[in-house]
């Protein structure tokens, strides 16, 4: 489970959120919706403790921001899969090697690497592209490689920051479907996006950063409708 307890989040001494109280349950699908610069990336970074609260506490799968040491942060991040908007793939290595690299760095037994890599690629429909170079793939395919890379280490949660930001509408829907498929296997998936209309067609628990507030509801109606409740004051 992930929990924010009276947490204040700042970036470069600029207040972003105040008195944030929020729980994310194991296996949950959660959207965080907000415009560029609204604070959603800060919120996502705090999940893997790249951003630490200046007050209060964040607890991520048993690791507390108050007590965790730098060495333990690396251990925590191994339990999480991170999906970036800009792919960050190694262009001089094949799709297979991009995933295998993650496993080698984390000390996975050599005998298990091929099976884990191919299983992850199969989850995103790219087992046929294992030998391809990333730059030879479409944008949507590259993002699917990024998702497979996040998945290959058997994470308890996947954190995706604008995973559809550089993609056309049809490909964006396809990427969300792959993330939902992963979530259906019991893996928590937290998605940050600026695209409210895209999320509307994929109902789930949603946080929206709107009018300098973080509000929450199941997204089945417009954000001006009933059912939204404050979660924290956002000062972005």
Q: At which residue positions do the language-model features occur?
A:
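Conserved ABC ATPase signature
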Residues: 133-137, 141-143
């Amino acid at each position: 489970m992930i929990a924010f307890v009276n947490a204040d989040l700042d970036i470069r001494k600029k207040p972003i959120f105040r008195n944030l109280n929020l729980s994310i349950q194991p296996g949950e699908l959660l959207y965080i919706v907000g415009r560029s610069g609204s604070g959603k990336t800060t919120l996502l970074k705090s999940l893997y403790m790249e951003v630490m609260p200046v007050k209060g506490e964040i607890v991520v799968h048993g690791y507390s921001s108050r007590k965790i040491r730098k060495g333990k942060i690396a251990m925590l991040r191994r339990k999480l899969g991170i999906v970036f908007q800009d792919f960050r793939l190694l262009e001089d290595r094949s799709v297979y090697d991009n995933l295998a690299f993650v496993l080698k760095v984390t000390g996975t037994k050599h005998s298990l690497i091929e099976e884990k890599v191919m299983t992850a690629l199969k989850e995103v429909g790219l087992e046929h592209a294992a030998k391809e170079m990333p730059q030879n793939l479409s944008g949507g395919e590259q993002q699917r490689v990024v998702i497979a890379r996040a998945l290959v280490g058997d994470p308890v949660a996947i954190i995706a920051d604008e995973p559809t930001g550089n993609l056309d509408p049809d490909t964006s829907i396809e990427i969300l479907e792959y993330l939902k498929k992963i979530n259906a296997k019991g893996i928590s998936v937290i998605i940050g996006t600026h695209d409210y209309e895209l999320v509307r067609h994929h109902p789930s628990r949603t946080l929206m950063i709107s009018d300098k507030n973080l509000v929450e509801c199941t997204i089945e109606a417009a954000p001006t409708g009933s059912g939204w409740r404050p979660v924290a004051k956002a000062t972005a």
